[in-house]
Each structure stands twice: as C-alpha cells, then as structure tokens.
Swiss-Prot record:
UniProtKB keywords: ATP-binding, Cell membrane, Cytoplasm, Membrane, Nucleotide-binding, Protein transport, Translocase, Translocation, Transport
GO BP, sorted A to Z: intracellular protein transmembrane transport; protein import; protein targeting; protein transport by the Sec complex
PANTHER family: CHLOROPLAST PROTEIN-TRANSPORTING ATPASE (PTHR30612:SF0), SECA INNER MEMBRANE COMPONENT OF SEC PROTEIN SECRETION SYSTEM (PTHR30612)
Protein known as: Protein translocase subunit SecA
Reactions that this protein is recorded to catalyse: ATP + H2O + cellular proteinSide 1 = ADP + phosphate + cellular proteinSide 2
GO CC aspect terms: cell envelope Sec protein transport complex; cytosol; plasma membrane
Amino acid sequence: MLNILKKLYNDDKRELKKFEKYANKVEGYADEMSKLTDEQLQAKTPEFRERIKKGESLDDLLPEAFAVAREGAKRVLGLYPFHVQILGGIALHFGNIAEMMTGEGKTLTATMPVYLNALEGKGVHVVTVNEYLSSRDEEEMGQLYKWLGLTVGLNLNSMSPDEKREAYNCDVTYSTNSELGFDYLRDNMVVYKEQMVQRPLNYAIIDEVDSILIDEARTPLIISGEAEQANSDYIRADRFVKNLSEDKSDDDVDDDEDYGDYKIDWPTKTISLTRTGIEKACKHFGLRNLYDVENQKLVHHIDQALRANYIMLKDIDYVVQDGEVLIVDSFTGRVMEGRRYSDGLHQAIEAKEGVKIQEESKTQATITYQNFFRMYKKLSGMTGTAKTEEEEFREIYNMQVITIPTNRPIARKDMPDILYPTLDSKFHAVVEEIKKRHANGQPVLVGTVAIESSERLSHLLDEAGIPHAVLNAKNHAKEAQIIMNAGQRGAVTIATNMAGRGTDIKLGPGVKELGGLAVIGTERHESRRIDNQLRGRSGRQGDPGYTRFYLSLEDDLMKRFGGDRVKDFLDRLSDNDDDKVIESRLITRQVESAQKRVEGNNYDIRKQTLQYDDVMRIQREIIYGERMQVIDADKSLKNVLIPMIHRTIDSQVDMFTQGDRSEWRLDSLRDFISSSLTSEQVTDSIDFKTISVEDLKKKLYDIVEKNFEDKEKALGDPSQMLEFEKVVILRVVDDRWTDHIDAMDQLRQSIGLRGYGQLNPLVEYQDSGYRMFEEMISNIEFDVTRLFMKAEIRQNISR
C-alpha cells in the first residue's frame, strides 16, 4: 500500500514538473501579449485556427493560446490568472483532474483550456452542478470568449430544441450534467435527424467533478413514459408491512429461529422478509406460496413497501411538501426537483406517507453519468477535494488527480474532533461554541449531514436568541445569497452538507482580525471528501479560519460502523457524565477507519454498478448505432430489411419443420405464413405435403421480393418508400428496446438471488442479458417482418 501511495505521489510530482515547463513558456509570452493592441490580440483566434488547419496540434499551441486567454482575461474581466492557475489549466487540457483549494479561482483557471480546445471548432462543454452556476459562469466568462471571437451558448432545461441546438453549435457551451445526459438520451429517441440537438461529444471540463462523477455516479438518468399500475396494490402492501417487526438478532446466531418478520443489513441498506414474515404474508394475502410466478407483482410491491417504511427516512432521504414526496440529494442536501425513485419505490413512499400516489413510469431510455461522460473524446475536471477518490478516477475514468499548489500558504486551524456520549450533549456543546463566537462577532458556518439535524439546531439557536440563516433542501432558492453573506461579521449559517457549493464565502470587513470564518461540523459524513469540502469553506486564499467536528456516539456513522469499541472506551473514561467531552487520537482513528470502510464499500458498489451497466452500455451503443444508420439513410433500406425478413423466415420454418415430415407442425407454420407474410389465399396454394424445407423458404423469399416490388409501385416515389421503411423499423425497435430496458432492470434486481446457488451474479447477468438481447433482436426482426409485409401503403406516412 505504501509503495502505491509513493508511486502516486511521484506521478503527481512528475506531471507537475512537466506542467511547470509549459507554464513557464506561457509566462514567457506575457510581455509580448501585453504589448498587443486589442485588435491584434483578438486576431490571434483566426490565426490559431488557421495553424490548426495546417496541422499544428493543440499541445503545440498551448503556451501562446494560454497567454492570449490570460491577457484577454486581464483586459475583459480585470482578472489575471496566477502561475498556479496556469498549472491548473494545463492539467485540465491534458485530461486530468485539477484539485484546487476553495477560493483558488477554478472558474478563471478553466478559461485557458476552454479557449485552447474551442479553437478546433468541435465544441467544449463546461459542466456545472446546477443552472444557477451555468448561467452565472456563462454570463461572466462568456464575455472573455466572445471578446476573443468565440461563440458561447447556455443550455437550460427550459429551452426549446432549436435553442438547445444553437447552444450546442457554439464553440463553448455551458450546461448542467443532467441536461447533457438527458439531451443525449432524447437525441437517441428522435425519428428525424433534424430533431437532434447535440454534436459528437468532444471535450468536457466538469466543475465539482467529484460531485458528478463520484457522488452521482450511480444515479441513472431515466426518461420515462407512464405505465398502467393499480395504486391499491401499493396501499395493500403498505398496510401489510406496517404491522411487521424487525429481526434484530445477530447474523452469527446459529439457531434456525427467526426473531422478527424482516431483517435489515444497514451497511448495504438491504431488507428482506424472514421465514416468519413470508408465512405472515401468505396468511395475510391468502396464498399457498408467496413466490409463485403469478405473485411476482405482489412480491415486488411488498419489497418496495419494506424499503419505503424501514430504509427510506423522512427528512433525510426525502421530504413531503404540498402533498408531494420529493427526493433529497444525500450529498448536497438539495431537493432533486422532478426526480422520482424508479421501479415503484416512489409510489411505495407515497403510500407510506398517505399522499396521492402518482402513476408508475416505464423507462424509455437510461444511462448513468459514468457511462455518459466516458463517451467524451477528452474529459477533465476541477474540484477542491478529489485526492481521497484518486484510485476511482484513475480506474474508471482514466483521469489522474493533480494537486495544484495554493497561491498563498493555508492559515486555517483544523482542530481535532471531540466526542460526546449523546446527541443532546453534543448539540448543547455546539450551541455554546456558536454563542461564544457569535458574541465576538466571528461568522460561523455550521455543517449538518441531514435536514433533521439542521432543523433541530435551528430550534436550539432560536431558544438561545441567536439570529441565523438555514440553508437546506427545504429553502435552496436563495442559497447562493445566503452563502455569500455567511462570511459577514456576526453571521451564523446552518448548511446541510455542501448546499451552496460553487459560491465563495468571502470575509466581510474586520472578520480577518476575529479569526476568519469558523466552521463547525456537527457530524462526520461517511465520506472524508465531504468533510474536507466543509473544512475548505474556511481559509480561502490564505485567509485565517477555524474548523472542528463535534461528534456523538449516537451519530449514524458511529452506530453503523464500529461504535462499540469507542463506547467501551468512553464508558471507562466518562464516569457516566453525559456532558463529558473526550479528545483522543483513538476517536479520530476510529472515525477515519469507519469512513475508509464506507468509502471502500461505496467504491465497490459503484464499480459493480459500472460492471453491470457496461452490459447495457454495449447493448445501448448497438441499438443507438443501428437506429442512427436508419435515420441517416438517404437511399432504400431494402438491403437491411430483406435479410431481417429472411432470417425470420428461416428461424420460423426451421422451428416448425423439425424431425420427420410426420412431426412437422403444419398448422402453426400455416398460421405464421398467413398472419405474418401473405394472404390466406396464397398460403392455401402451397402444397405443404410435398414441398421441401429449402423450396418452401425459396418460395417465401419470392413472396417477400414481390411484396417489396408491389409496395414500391404503389408509392411510386422512392423517398416515400424510404420513409415507409424507416417508420416500420423505428417503431418496432423503439417498442422492443423499451420493453428490453424494463426486462434488464428486473433481471438486475432478481439476479442477486442466484448468488445463493454458488453462481457469480455478474456472470449470470452478463449471460442472461446477452441471451435476452439476442431474443430482442429476433423479436425486432419478427415484428418488422409482420409489420412490413402486412402493412397497407398510405401516402403521408408519419413516423
């Protein structure tokens, strides 16, 4: 392990050394650029583009182009990138992650690689976590790019396809990660090429890259259509599970007895019925066997009702507002507008909370951020905290994390954690600490992990008469404004996790003298990176600052991972005094060890997600590629359709003519021919008693050929025939693909059970997924055969 760390450290140093050489060359152009007139500086853009056309590479242009962007920033924005920002920009250009501390000017850093890469004219996407940041950065930094002769676009959720297309056709496009992903999926659902909005994915710079590629890696982007579903099923399942009790016995108990109706595995957040629970379900619903095939839907509803009632926590995982269940992002603490849990979980939570149950949706297209961003030709990112996830970035995205030095030394004091026996004693201590600092006028930012904690603390501060602002998923409309004011004298701000990320906290007048911004964490997050983000809110650009985490044995992390050892240790020291505070290296080590375990666990889950999603990725790329060829076609698709129909004929005829002629299933064969290929009259004219298999196939091929010619004559216009062919293929492919996505999702959820049979679930998923994909292709060809052969020709066919 030590050797790996040493190697990473050396790689980092080696890369920085290489970047230093480039940075010095950029600095070497500074005088030359400063002497140019505005017109001469602006003329550099067409000059660079001409040089690229003649074969000069972006790497060759880097020093001069960076110097142009740097000088342009000074003239247009009044900001001149420091040497460390040039280093960060170089790291981004070479497809790395630039780890830069809060307040080190990541937005300005990105202008240089954005300018350089935009010169190719293939499009650069600057990706942010929300539309506020996209709009802000496009407005501010867009001035520079426009001044330098580039086009700049902003891609928003509310825009029409025409507006989006215009934004994507610009040299530089600002967008959120979700909008990029959804536009990609929508582009692969269109039926006319002109409806597409995106160009091929070229280069992206992701701001807050850890938030998007790590925290949201497992979040699939889903485009859904409504599916029929009886809401009463959710209510029945909900009523049943509400009367169950948890089995809290240890896993290592040897007896076969159940101690409750369901069991929860908290580290993986999985829940299942025990045998007692299964017996209760059979009795409650009047069944002989809960797991009979016909009870599949009921089992699904019970599973989701269990998750909704005992795993999903109100005000932590979701909130209820105006009779609606809204998901809370566990990393940002924000409500995820318009996002719904899939597969009926959202409806199960609605049943649990007694609000109106909305229709279950059917997935039409889906992709994870992991697989979407891996499609870019070049990818880079910026964040203040990525080093703890370095291995994941390298393994999954092939990106190295380069720690960029700060422009000024860090003056912030990071104090050791302190631990209390109970939540009450911890919150009491936090309020006292805030009171003391507030009395001196020092601004305080308090970080909480859950909405529940922020509201509890807010109530305690109200009782203490301390004015404060609360920033959580319930009121994020003004979050940027609240965060901007958090550094003013006397300000007390409570923030759930990293709400307001991307907005700097600047210190107000006289605050430096008071010790800068004090950051108090009320709980350790399961990821060290999120804790580091909270710390990084204080001490920007060499400012003074103070940070400390207050913990209790009743914190979620302590309860879930290894709290017993700490509790024993505390019992020995504390003499049963609830207000006794413990500062010990053991506590810090135990917390960090728990965090590392959770991080390792989460990484394994994300890696596994990717392995499973790779099966769908390959299938998705095949379907989307074939679809695009159909949409793009400008001449007859006969050479695609005829082989599809021939394969269908071959498989169906072979299936019905196995064995001796006496064993042939002639009735089924006749049905296939008359229902899928031709009329009953033509079918009756075939002498099935004497014809050979090969002659039958040839006869059917001839019928297909004649049908094709008849349709061409009926339409008269080759473009109309092409349109008809496209309609047939696209309708069938889209219907079958949508069904396949659902089937693969159900396979994914059921596959874990096969692990009990000593089988590798991933291998089983890959094998079953491959078979299902082949079956889907076969079904597509069968449906295309029937639709093409039996469809009546009409003018003005609509896709």
